[in-house]
Amino acid sequence: RSKQIIASMTIGKDVSKLFPDVVKVIRTKNIELKKLVYLYLINYAKIKPDLIFLAVAAFHSDAKEGATPLIRGLAIRTMGCIQVPEVVSYLGETLTYCFKDKDPYVRKIAALCVPKLYLTSPQLVREKDFLNTLHDCLKDENPVVVANSMQALNEISVLSGANQLKLKSKYLRHIVKYHRKTKQ
């Protein structure tokens, strides 16, 4: 039934009235079904902002305690795509511990969510000190996390009109080291 709902949504049919029913499926362990539910929620969150709070706890739980890095990353990516105040406030809190996740996949997704958060709430990005967190990620052991952090800082620079990508020599040495490795 969920696949039918998503198929209807993708061809332009209004299935927003099913929002409460779809939210009930969010706790599924089936990753494919979870992806479909998250896609639906991204699509209809602005239409049903009063109901998105039903999903916020599940996003938060999946991002923090998801069984796999894929689920944790999917949860924060979805939260980043939903520009509704109820989700934005939780995203700030959620990103704080996602940047500390042991898996680089989760950290790279966290980095990419900061510009989305900045678009909606620059004040929250400053309060949570995410610009410094992104700069700290420039020293990450994973080159994809480093690249995504640079991309995020660049996007925020464009959005803010001020250069946020202030590379210190310690960051540059680290970045050059990874650049050499990836060229080989």
Predicted regions and their residues:
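HEAT/HEAT-like alpha-solenoid repeats
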Residues: 15-26, 50-63, 87-99, 124-138, ...
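Beta-propeller blade termini and top-face loops
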Residues: 69-71, 80, 104-105, 111-122, ...
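Alpha-helical solenoid scaffolds in large eukaryotic transport, assembly, and signaling factors
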Residues: 1-58, 79-83
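Hydrophobic residues within the alpha-helices of tandem HEAT/HEAT-like
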Residues: 5-9, 40-46, 77-84, 112-120, ...
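Short inter-helical turns and helix N-cap capping residues of alpha-solenoid HEAT/ARM repeat scaffolds
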Residues: 29-30, 66-68, 102-104, 141-142, ...
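Internal, well-ordered domain-core segments that constitute the primary functional module
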Residues: 102, 114-148
